[in-house]
Amino acid sequence: VIAINPWLQNSAAMPYAIDRPESNLSLAEMTEVAIANLYGKKNGGKGKWNRRGDGFFIMVEGGKIDWACHANDAMAAIGDTLDFDNAIGVALEFYKKHPRETLIVVTGDHETGGMTIGHATTAYKAYYDRLLEQENSFQYFNDNQWAAHKAAYADATCPSDHDPSTLESNTAMLELMESASV
């Protein structure tokens, strides 16, 4: 059985927790539904373990944590880690009711060289207060605000040979603006 969020288009990935619309299911809600469906169908829908040993396996992946770390997006990584933690909480509630029949394994698959936010032996500051002001992921920014930023320059006249609407970085935008002001 594969549970798919009904609001996702085609095979799209879930959005980061920080970007998730109210209509989308959280990882915890998907975990809750999976447990209810798999356990509730046992033994004629009575939700009790039988002696035949029929059990079930659920894998819940907080895969967007890794995506956020690759993007160096601290708040998206933190938000999706908390989202995954909430899903684990749902599984733990099931465990509390069925401790002899339940095994929960939580592991990281390859997020071992991720980003560093501050370091104890340097003067680098983490600016956590600024992180709390972040309202969406870098991916959301890139897909939405950056496109609007580029569109604002689409009709700009510029002495350089660059088409401002094709720029893909703020550095390139700055260089274009500097060359236009010369």
Residue positions per predicted region:
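A post-motif C-terminal structural segment
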Residues: V1-V182
